[in-house]
């Protein structure tokens, strides 16, 4: 995942919808983003709306996991150098959050 290494700031913080506290650091953030790649059915995953304002981006996405529709947003804060400093994911509806939690835990156990 060399692309992630180049994209993430060393002091990045990742906030997951399935973990209670924010996750600090590049290596842990990478681990969660890789697990998300296995979780989010990337064949159907698509960004449907983007809003950018200076060093902040909000990207709305949709996908389907095990026949459950998932709708969410990635909220990203960038450094002046173009690296991700803060990455927060929010998901709805509740059934989707539960499915993502189940799949993420499984993907993380395999890493």
Question: Over which residues does each language-model region extend?
Answer:
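A solvent-exposed, acidic/Ser-Thr-rich amphipathic alpha-helical stretch
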Residues: 2-54
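A beta-strand edge to alpha-helix "cap/lid" segment located at domain peripheries
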Residues: 37-111
């Amino acid at each position: 995942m060399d692309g992630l290494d180049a994209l993430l700031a060393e002091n990045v913080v990742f906030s997951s919808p399935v973990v209670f506290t924010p996750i600090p650091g590049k290596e842990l953030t990478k681990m969660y983003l890789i697990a998300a790649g296995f979780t989010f059915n990337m064949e159907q995953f698509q960004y449907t709306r983007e809003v950018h304002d200076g060093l902040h981006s909000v990207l709305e996405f949709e996908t389907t996991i095990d026949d459950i529709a998932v709708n969410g947003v990635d909220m990203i804060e960038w450094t002046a150098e173009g690296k991700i400093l803060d990455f927060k994911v929010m998901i709805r509806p509740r059934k989707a959050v539960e499915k993502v939690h189940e799949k993420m835990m499984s993907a993380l156990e395999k890493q």
